Amino acid sequence: MKIERIEAIPYSIPYARPLKFASGEVTSAEHVLVRIYTDTGICGVADTPPRPYTYGETQDSIVSVVTKVFAPQLIGLDPLDRSKVQQLLRRTVNNPTAKGALDIALWDVIGISLGTPVHKLLGGFTDSMRVSHMLGFKPAAELLEEALRFRETYGINTFKLKTGRRPLSLDVEACHVLREGLGTDTEIYLDANRGWTANEAMEVLRRTEGLGLSMLEEPCDAGEALGRRRLVQHSSIPIVGDESVPTLGDVSRELLSGGSNAICIKTARSGFTEAQQILGLCEGLGVDVTMGNQIDTQVGSLATVTFGAAFEASSRRAGELSNYLDMTDDLLAEPLKIHDGAIRVREVPGVGAAIDADKLQRYRQDRA
């Protein structure tokens, strides 16, 4: 079996409303669908979410690097030669989500060729993941209303509150209102997307002490090394690295330097192969992980479920899997369903991300 052709298809699907957080705002999913074809007729699929304000990638740059840089190197290789593929991808610096999509699409090819679900090939620990829902920048009362609605409609009982606003009282108030309205049995954690300084983050933790918050993700820029380390040392809850740890090397640096003591894994930027390496490092060091969301479509969310459910350590916490609900449509032929607060893996060969051809034709951006 050889790689015969690689496609990178730009497409755009609007969000029902703008998604706002400390590092930016998005109004539509300007993503790239990656498809890898083999000479045996197999097609592997993955989704690529550009995040220019986080990783420097754009829709155009992803299409270009996939088709002009990676495809010429990968065509003719056996998809099962995974280490050789990784060595070729590493030759080109940066471009994490382009590399991640190629890796996931190749795992999809391998699963289909072997007639086995990829979550089984990876580890097969469980068949579902609990879902965490992200709450964006809104007045506190509206945040509580949304959380209660998602708990009632989908059974979700874990919420990630986007923070990093000024004045700090906006986020402090939101934390208190959510805890009072949701009760003590609901998990709430924070993600500041580098919106605060280390001192501001410490102040927020002081003013929310006793609310039972479970984690604080990317409170400040990891470049504030001393402030970040001081925050980790004095915080009673884990400080999670996310944007600061896109690669295995970054994870090693942040953990060993004391800049983070928990790690967010995002398959969109690491693929399944590097995500496994990151998970193994964290397990060896006794560090908790969360499965994050790159504002993923259903295609991307299914990839996260596939990886997260494969291992005990990655399935302990609820994964960030509901962002696709903010989209007006999706490319997945068989939509994901959240039932009793969880999403199940697909018990089919590969990842199971069959694409609706009509919808792809409607939303693709590379044809007039």
Description of each model-found segment:
Residues 93, 103-139:
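Glycine-rich, aromatic-flanked loop segments that form ligand/cofactor-binding clefts
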Residues 3, 34, 41, 70, ...:
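Conserved, mostly hydrophobic/aromatic
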Residues 5, 37-113:
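Metal- or metallocofactor-binding catalytic centers and their adjacent structured scaffolds
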Residues 1-45, 49-55, 326-329:
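Structured beta-strand/loop patches that form or line metal/cofactor-binding pockets in enzymes
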Residues 351-368:
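Extended hydrophobic packing segments that form well-structured cores
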Residues 122-235:
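Metal-dependent enolase-superfamily TIM-barrel catalytic cores that perform enediolate-based chemistry
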Residues 48, 133-135, 161-163, 190-194, ...:
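A cross-domain feature marking catalytic cores of carbohydrate-active enzymes
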Residues 70, 212, 223-240, 245-342, ...:
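Shared catalytic-loop signature of beta/alpha-barrel
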